[in-house]
Each structure stands twice: as C-alpha cells, then as structure tokens.
Amino acid sequence: MLFIFLTIAALGLSFWAQFKVKSNFEKYSKVEASSGRTGAETARRILDINGLYDVPVEPVRGTLTDHYDPTRRVVRLSEPVYYGRSISAISVASHEVGHALQHQESYGALVLRHKIFPVVNFASGVAPLLFLGGMLLGSLNLIGLGIILFSAAVFFQLITLPVEFNASSRAKQIIVSEGFIRNNEENGVNKVLSAAALTYVAAALVSLFELLRFVMIFLNGRDEN
C-alpha cells in the first residue's frame, strides 16, 4: 500500500513538473533577452567558442522538442527556441549545447547513457509484458525477469539526472559569462532550467517506485510459495 501511495505521489510530482516546465517556458518566452540573440544564434556562438564548428544547429517542429543527437552530432531546437529571442529560448538552446560540450569531452554519464540506450529501449518495451504475463499466469519467473529488465530502464533514468543537471549548470555558466543574459535575467533562466530538471527527477522517482512495487510483489509471492 505504501508503494502505491508513493507511486501516486511521484506521478503527481511528474504532472506538476510538466505543468511548471510549460508555464515557465511560456512565461519567459514573452520576455525578450537584453542581448537580442535568438536561440539559434546563442547555440551557434557557444559551439564556436568551444571549437565545435562542425556541429550544426537545426530547427525542428513542435514545442519543447529540443534535443542534442549524439549519434549525428547535431543540436536540434524547436522553432520557438530556434527563432525566439527570449530568455526561454536562450536558456533551452544553451542547455542543449551543454550536451554537445559533454559529448566533446566524453562526459562519463552521457557516454554510458548513449551506449546502453538500445538495451534499455528493448527492456522498457518487454518488461511490462513480462509483468502482466507473470501476474496473469502466477509465474514468479516471468515477474523476476521483468524486474531485471525494468531495472535497466530505472538505471537509465537515474544516470540521466547528472547528465541533465550538468548540462544546465554548464548552460547557466556560459550564458552569464558570455553576456547572453544580464542582471535579473538570470532568475528567469534558473526557473526555466530548474523546472525542466524537475521533470527528470519525477520520472526517475515514478520508475523507481514502480520497480520497488514489483519487487515486493515478487518477494510476497515467493514467501507464499
């Protein structure tokens, strides 16, 4: 019962975090940065400063679809960020470039996350089926196998946390030192990036509590046998 309550609480945190990301992004999308740079210009400048001239910056459709692709080595920014001159645009653009800088120096957590992604992607798809099959058939072996596979997905989300926090830290340091934001604009940057980081924390908690719930089901079933 406790784990169910914790999972519900984590889900609530996840929904709240998503709301905060969208609301803060929209709020500071309306506040133009004093530097007058677009998100694309900000990203390009930071990449060039760090010698990453061969890493392109491309627009991508959607909102909050921004990401760095380590396979193709490209920074993709949603159109509101790519073309925007707001505090939100500069914050998100610099965060994604932070991942490119991590890649440049072979930041351990990023490299590990990239290497295990194919395995985790497979495990995430199969684990729920094993849990369902195990509970319907009363098979502890299937549940146990599901736990092993789901553990990989939880591990992936946990190592995502330092990757995202580090990228945000790099982003704030660079845009302040280079003068992309000034004075009280830093407060807006902190709110945009902190809300985004919270979504990863919430997702990790949801996965962790789900894993613990299935571990308890497995242990209780074993005791009954």
Curated annotation (Swiss-Prot):
Pfam families: Zn_peptidase_2. It is an enzyme of class 3 (hydrolase). GO terms for molecular function: metal ion binding; metallopeptidase activity. It comes from the Bacteria. PROSITE patterns: ZINC_PROTEASE. Keywords: Cell membrane, Hydrolase, Membrane, Metal-binding, Metalloprotease, Protease, Transmembrane, Transmembrane helix, Zinc. Its main location: membrane. Its EC number is 3.4.24.-. Zn(2+) binds at residues 95, 99, 103. It is found in: Cell membrane. It is a multi-pass membrane protein. GO terms for biological process: proteolysis. InterPro entries: Zn_peptidase_2. The chain crosses the membrane at residues 116-138, 140-162, 192-212. One of its GO terms (cellular component) is plasma membrane. The active site is at residue 96. This is Putative membrane protease YugP. It comes from Bacillus subtilis (strain 168).
